[in-house]
């Protein structure tokens, strides 16, 4: 069999709070790599503490990409990510470095590695019309309307997920085809890389739950509420009629802090709700990761030497 001459890349996945960011840096230092964030919240400026965003020292130690590239009142799609990540990969490969893609946003990984169907781009006028209808009738009503034209997509979207409801209706109104029909088309532009997929996840769920709880407590101690309050009072967000519909503000921890600052519940309830929501996020991520049949799983506390051996074998073959 001829040698695979495609450039190598590392895909490091895992649930939230599993230690991916530090491992990505360790790999980058050891094998001359650069880190590409695959996280739908790390793209936003000003969301630092609640996202466990790599700090300045971590980002200075090795190059990082696709962090702090959007304002929190802007939208950033999986297609945007795939485009930007490809550009970053090309630049890294040209420098002779190893691309290390790390994060927990499954849709972004799929968009990059498998490609997206060529759906219509965003249409500002249609999007504004849908938002106005939602303000008048509610997102639940629009979810019902979506089910009438695209039952498959509606079944996958919760009635409280305005971003995805809006996009699905937008696709239908712009093209006359449902999102599920578009998604059934063959994907385009698969990534021309030789990829090693690694999953970092504690073997025992209680370990992950402990890490989640400890991390959120540290976030609160480090000023998460002040960070959320600064976002709430920013003129571009404060002027919005429904700021909690912003993708950035729906991030786990941020919505709960916002609602706590609104007086909806106590500090103890804030902690409990945020930890529970983060556990649910981790559960969804683990469910998706189990479908990545070609990925190798590692425990963050016990498999460091095994990770090194797998990396050496992959890069030297």
UniProtKB/Swiss-Prot annotation:
Matches recorded under InterPro entries: Dimethylallyltransferase, IPT, P-loop_NTPase
Keyword ATP-binding carried by entry: yes
Location of the region described as Interaction with substrate tRNA in the Swiss-Prot/TrEMBL record: 39-42, 163-167
UniProt keyword annotations, A-Z: ATP-binding, Magnesium, Nucleotide-binding, Transferase, tRNA processing
Site (Interaction with substrate tRNA) residue list: 105, 127
Single biological process term from Gene Ontology: tRNA modification
Stated family: Belongs to the IPP transferase family.
Subunit details: Monomer.
Name under which the protein is recorded: tRNA dimethylallyltransferase
Species of provenance: Xylella fastidiosa (strain Temecula1 / ATCC 700964)
Taxonomic lineage of the native organism: Bacteria, Pseudomonadati, Pseudomonadota, Gammaproteobacteria, Lysobacterales
Gene name per UniProt: miaA
